[in-house]
């Protein structure tokens, strides 16, 4: 069984657990997905627990920068953006840009030659 989680300041209303569980179970994978709200004071303990005990986890505000020193390395867009929203095997990734690009493509929007402002990623 995959052990997954999301960590953020207050993730009590997050849909991440339902979304990831639905998708993974649809693919025939058994998983659990924990919502881990963390204060700044508890972040060190929680980050270490996630890295030691979970297969992968998501990171949301305000910890997308704070998680980086705990990681072995960052790859891809996480290097470019300097922020991490997904961790697997001690490696940090950022899927925000790819997700945004996919949304544009799926809605027939071509940003080529246009100015784009992204807020809240």
Residues of each region from the PLM?
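Conserved beta-strand elements of the Class I
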Residues: 5, 117-119
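Glycine-rich Rossmann-fold phosphate-binding loop(s) that bind the pyrophosphate
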Residues: 9, 120-121
């Amino acid at each position: 069984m995959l052990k997954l989680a999301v960590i953020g300041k207050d993730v009590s209303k997050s849909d991440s657990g339902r979304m990831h569980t639905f998708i993974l179970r649809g693919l025939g994978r058994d998983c659990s997905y924990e919502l881990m709200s963390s204060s700044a004071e508890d972040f060190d303990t929680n980050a270490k627990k996630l890295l030691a005990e979970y297969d992968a986890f998501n990171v949301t505000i305000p910890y997308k920068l704070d998680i980086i020193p705990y990681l072995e390395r960052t790859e891809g867009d996480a290097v470019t953006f300097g922020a991490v929203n997904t961790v697997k095997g001690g490696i940090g990734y950022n899927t925000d840009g790819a997700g945004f690009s996919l949304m544009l493509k799926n809605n027939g929007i071509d940003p080529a030659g246009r100015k784009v402002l992204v807020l809240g990623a």
